[in-house]
Amino acid sequence: MPEYRSKTSTYGRNMAGARALWRATGMKDDDFQKPIIAIANSFTQFVPGHVHLKDLGQLVAREIERLGGVAKEFNTIAVDDGIAMGHDGMLYSLPSREIIADSVEYMANAHCADALVCISNCDKITPGMLMASLRLNIPTVFVSGGPMEAGKTKLTDHKLDLVDAMVLAADPHASDEEVAAVERSACPTCGSCSGMFTANSMNCLTEALGLSLPGNGTVVATHSDRKQLFLNAGRTVIELCHRWYGNEDATALPRGIATFAAFENAITLDIAMGGSTNTILHLLAAAQEAEVPFTMQDIDRLSRNVPQLCKVAPNTQKYHIEDVHRAGGIFGILAELARGNLLHTDVATVHSKTLGEAIATWDIIGTQDEAVHTFYKAGPAGISTQVAFSQSTRWPSLDTDRTEGCIRDMEHAFSKEGGLAVLYGNIAQDGCVVKTAGVDASIHVFEGSALVYESQEAAVKGILSDEVQPGMIVVIRYEGPKGGPGMQEMLYPTSYLKSKGLGKQCALFTDGRFSGGTSGLSIGHASPEAAAGGAIGLIRDGDRIRIDIPQRAINVLISEEELASRRLEQHAIGWKPAQSRTRKVSSALKAYALLATSADKGAVRNKTLL
């Protein structure tokens, strides 16, 4: 049987010094025979999705200790993409994913931890910890801080979120008072932003991957039911330790759970729920860490066969994550996919022998278990707070309407093709991605003239000064992982297009990426990126570009000869922006750019250069 990794620093006379230091942390004689379980917390006061996590690591720790383990907590960094948005701070967001992954690996390996609990929540933290867990391949459980409650104001009938505040702020017809009212109401509680944005998308995907407990992605941060998720995470990691170190059960390890089939399940869920396009980037990165050959081609293949069964903000103003939970949460969607024979139900999870068994237990349509029904009635209280587990409000009933409800069955899908698609063409030879869930059907085929910007800042200025007109395709390049560096999110350009009434009259194409809050004909992750010699760098103002989502195609309508001629010309002068940019790029960002791959590889480090 495998030995505890921690024996390296706790066993034998030569480790007297290490044990002396362990004792100084509070360990006693009996503790040196127990598994040492690392708790990677991501508490910070900078991020609403993490502001309430300070004491939750110790909540898990006490449960681990009660069940016979030794718990040791440490913290990672966490960047708030919304606060970093629209200025040079966004250059640091995606690179922070690698820093988080490295820091978890460093702490777990330096101290020979036997297992891991990941307390994550927002955009790059869950992916970074996911990458680390698959590198380490020690028993691991994920538990997130949970989603924020949606906001409310007397000015609108629909619920609010961060994107509403951004769009209204750019609307010249909105008064300062209206903007202030929405600003104060859009983000009322702690938790990850309330729509199907990147953070919530990733926390939902950990359920499909099998690495977190049911409800991880959908129980609001303020609800008392989430406390039980944290306690259960402590219990589950102890069980996983027993299974691996006691029985050498490989399905207790992240790589035994997050197999190729599990990655297919995760992207199938992602497509069905219309998740953030960032999830594609992060799943590809995680697959590489797991040494699973999961690629853009697999995503393209699945996107053609999976319908959209759930539609949540920003793709509609009717539903937020709290509504998904009321409709049965992620297991509600997984159950419908399973009924459509679109899932691998024989894969393992941290909490059940197989995903199929878990669906049978947690599907609100199929089970009569009142405890499960009560669990999925956990709802928002509508009280502004930064305190976790501070309310116990329950919906009076579940949303079991699979015809017109938040979650649909296969027959009544929002669309027969899912919410994400991969496009290929002469300006995206290795692919690009679009969240079709947020694209009006009338512009699934769109042709327009290119208006090229060499940076997000220039594009924002152009949109706000009315350079962009109906029928144009805004091209923003040199914003990829290497070219940015850091692959900025383009939420401001897309929000401003909406505020100008151009959401259905223009498209945006970039080698950067989009916030989970983005909707509209916004196509990102163009690969190869411009800085890596990608053809997006060859587009010129006035070029006609044709986007055809049904055919999964995007092309600039010029001859191959002209494209080749432009390539030779560009190669001679170098793949860099035509206009200089006043952008401060630190040595840390330059180091990231030196190794960064394009988005089709997950924007991970190019290991061939190491």
From Swiss-Prot:
Pathway: Amino-acid biosynthesis; L-isoleucine biosynthesis; L-isoleucine from 2-oxobutanoate: step 3/4; Amino-acid biosynthesis; L-valine biosynthesis; L-valine from pyruvate: step 3/4
Alphabetical keyword list: 2Fe-2S, Amino-acid biosynthesis, Branched-chain amino acid biosynthesis, Iron, Iron-sulfur, Lyase, Magnesium, Metal-binding
One GO cellular component, as annotated: cytosol
Binding-site positions, Mg(2+): 81, 123-124, 489
Highest rank taxon of the organism: Bacteria
InterPro entries found in the cross-reference section: Dihydro-acid_dehy_C, DihydroxyA_deHydtase, DiOHA_6PGluconate_deHydtase_CS, ILV_EDD_C, ILV_EDD_N, IlvD/EDD_N
GO terms for MF: 2 iron, 2 sulfur cluster binding; dihydroxy-acid dehydratase activity; magnesium ion binding
Positions annotated as active site in the UniProt record: 515 (proton acceptor)
Ligase found in the keyword field: no
Enzyme kind, highest EC tier: lyase
Modification N6-carboxylysine, positions: 124
GO biological process annotation, one example: L-valine biosynthetic process
Cofactor binding summary note: Binds 1 [2Fe-2S] cluster per subunit. This cluster acts as a Lewis acid cofactor.
Transmembrane segments: none
Reaction equation(s) it catalyzes: (2R)-2,3-dihydroxy-3-methylbutanoate = 3-methyl-2-oxobutanoate + H2O; (2R,3R)-2,3-dihydroxy-3-methylpentanoate = (S)-3-methyl-2-oxopentanoate + H2O
Binding-site list for [2Fe-2S] cluster: 122, 193
EC number: 4.2.1.9
Cofactor requirements of the protein: [2Fe-2S] cluster; Mg(2+)
Family matches, as PANTHER family: D-XYLONATE DEHYDRATASE, D-XYLONATE DEHYDRATASE YAGF-RELATED
Similarity comment text for this entry: Belongs to the IlvD/Edd family.
HAMAP family: IlvD
Purpose of the protein: Functions in the biosynthesis of branched-chain amino acids. Catalyzes the dehydration of (2R,3R)-2,3-dihydroxy-3-methylpentanoate (2,3-dihydroxy-3-methylvalerate) into 2-oxo-3-methylpentanoate (2-oxo-3-methylvalerate) and of (2R)-2,3-dihydroxy-3-methylbutanoate (2,3-dihydroxyisovalerate) into 2-oxo-3-methylbutanoate (2-oxoisovalerate), the penultimate precursor to L-isoleucine and L-valine, respectively.
Subunit structure: Homodimer.
Designated name of the protein: Dihydroxy-acid dehydratase
Gene behind this protein: ilvD
